[in-house]
Design a protein with these regions (language model features):
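N-terminal signal-anchor transmembrane alpha helix
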Residues: 1-30
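Interfacial helix-start motif at the membrane-water boundary
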Residues: 42-70
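Alpha-helical transmembrane segments of helical membrane proteins, especially in multi-pass transport
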Residues: 104-126
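Mid-length scaffold segments of soluble, non-membrane domains
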Residues: 77-86, 96-110
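Transmembrane alpha-helix/helix-exit interface in multi-pass inner-membrane proteins
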Residues: 24-28, 67-90
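Terminal transmembrane helical module of multi-pass membrane proteins
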Residues: 125-178
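Alpha-helical transmembrane segments of multipass membrane proteins
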Residues: 60-64, 87, 159
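Perimembrane loop-to-helix junctions flanking transmembrane segments
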Residues: 31-49, 176
């Protein structure tokens, strides 16, 4: 069982990454970008570390739903990539930053992609068990543990992301391309 768990995690990590990259390669018109940025600015106006955590958790928890979680996770991945494309359209100076570098080279990006991949792969394992009519009782404890891991990582990630945003806004650190 552990081998299947590890393999499914890495398979969905790869799929999540590819779908995110495809979303980030989307062509976004100036009008769509302006509309997105207006909504995005409203969303993050008074957000803090806990707000980021709540936002990311409301995205992550449905990913545990058997079957549905796979589609929800991949839609979330594409949407996040598309959001990056919209931001690049409105801020061309960040066009040279690889979207995958934000995902894999930032501490909060790693925590988020690990969490989402864990949740999506658990959704796959659960739907596979349902289809094969496997007793689901054996999956309760590992699923609860994984939900705990995801919530903990997203809590830490939310505060790390907020802290880094604050540092960049206060110009306490310089990030290449910003």
């Amino acid at each position: 069982m552990n081998k299947i768990r590890i393999i499914s995690f890495f398979v969905f990590l790869g799929i999540f990454t590819c779908v995110f990259q495809l979303g980030s390669m989307s062509t976004v018109s100036e009008e769509e970008s302006a509309l997105f940025m207006e909504e995005f600015e409203k969303l993050v106006l008074d957000i803090d570390g806990f707000g980021i955590f709540v936002h990311n958790t409301t995205i992550a928890l449905p990913m545990f739903i058997p079957g549905f979680g796979i589609f929800w996770g991949l839609f979330s991945s594409w949407s996040t990539g598309y959001a990056f494309a919209a931001i690049v359209t409105s801020m061309p100076e960040i066009a040279n930053i690889s979207p995958l570098s934000i995902l894999f080279l930032s501490p909060f990006g790693l925590m988020e992609i690990f969490s989402y991949s864990l949740a999506i792969s658990r959704s796959f394992i659960l739907i596979k068990a349902i289809i094969t009519k496997t007793n689901l009782l054996q999956f309760i404890k590992p699923t609860i543990i994984e939900i705990g891991i995801v919530v903990t990582l997203l809590l830490a990630g939310g505060y790390v992301e907020f802290y880094l945003i604050e540092l960049v806004q206060n110009e306490s650190i310089e990030m290449p391309g910003f």
